[in-house]
From Swiss-Prot:
Domain of life of the native organism: Eukaryota
Name of the featured protein: Homeobox protein Dlx3b
Gene symbol of the encoding locus: dlx3b
Keyword DNA-binding: yes
Function: Involved in the development of the inner ear.
Length: 269
């Protein structure tokens, strides 16, 4: 093994090992690797802190101020934010009160507009009177003869037919009733309201029994004629009494209808 061949192999192996070691240097031969890695880590860490660390505290602070604006947050940080909802609420409530108060005052001032000062004295202004046409007056008069009081559907229908409002129809009927009562009380009922004029208001009550009916029946009994029952309908409980009264009248007719022969004075004495 100590021959020339072995000596030649050893330098070849050493050269191969040195070549391989030169291709793959160790950490001791390359001192820049740790420094570069350290600088790279510091560079990236500094940028990471620069881009990430400021936003999080800012967002947390803003979120904290937003949520705790009215719950003991740092005073003076956002004065407009803490007072904005309260001021808005106060302004909104004040605005609502301003909107609600004018209708009340307007309602109170409505009667004052109808009062006018005449010679230093307040005088109420009367509304203009409604002028009815001849057709409307004739239709209202005909309806008044049928009924003095109208129901709501009837009043609405009549107002629609005549082109009037329901208030105008109601006021006309009220005035007409008061006028009729006044004339009837004074005994000055006009001809149009007489019973012969087919006025239902004058004939609303059932006809009273005539006074001469009893006299007529008594005269018929005296003349011996059987009285006939009247054509007017009578209640059922009155029929028995009337039949009994008629039968009594028929018994009374014999002594009246067949009187005895007159006796002369000479025959008696």
């Amino acid at each position: 093994m100590s021959g020339p061949t072995y000596d030649r192999k050893i330098p070849g192996i050493s050269t191969d090992l040195s070549g391989s070691m030169s291709c793959h240097p160790t950490s001791k031969d390359s001192p820049t690797l740790p420094e570069s890695s350290a600088t790279d880590m510091g560079y990236y860490s500094s940028h990471h802190e620069y881009y990430q660390s400021p936003p999080y505290p800012q967002q947390m602070n803003s979120y904290h101020q937003f949520n705790l604006s009215g719950m003991g947050a740092t005073p003076g940080a956002y004065p407009t934010k803490t007072e904005y909802p309260y001021n808005t609420y106060r302004q909104y409530g004040h605005f609502n009160r301003d909107l609600q108060t004018p209708p009340q005052s307007a309602v109170k001032e409505e009667p004052e507009t109808e009062v006018r000062m005449v010679n230093g004295k307040p005088k109420k202004i009367r509304k203009p009177r409604t002028i009815y046409s001849s057709y409307q007056l004739a239709a209202l008069q005909r309806r008044f003869q049928k009924a003095q009081y109208l129901a709501l559907p009837e009043r609405a229908e009549l107002a629609a037919q005549l082109g009037l409002t329901q208030t105008q129809v109601k006021i006309w009927f009220q005035n007409r009733r008061s006028k009729f009562k006044k004339l009837y009380k004074n005994g000055e009922v006009p001809l149009e309201h007489s019973p012969n004029a087919s006025d239902s208001m004058a004939c609303n009550s059932p006809p009273s029994p005539a006074v001469w009916d009893n006299n007529a029946h008594s005269s018929q009994v005296n003349r011996g004629q059987i009285p006939q029952p009247p054509l007017s309908s009578t209640p059922p409980y009155m029929e028995d009494y009337s039949n009994h009264w008629y039968q009594q009248g028929s018994h009374l007719q014999h002594p009246v209808h067949h009187p005895g022969p007159p006796q002369s004075v000479g025959a008696v004495y």
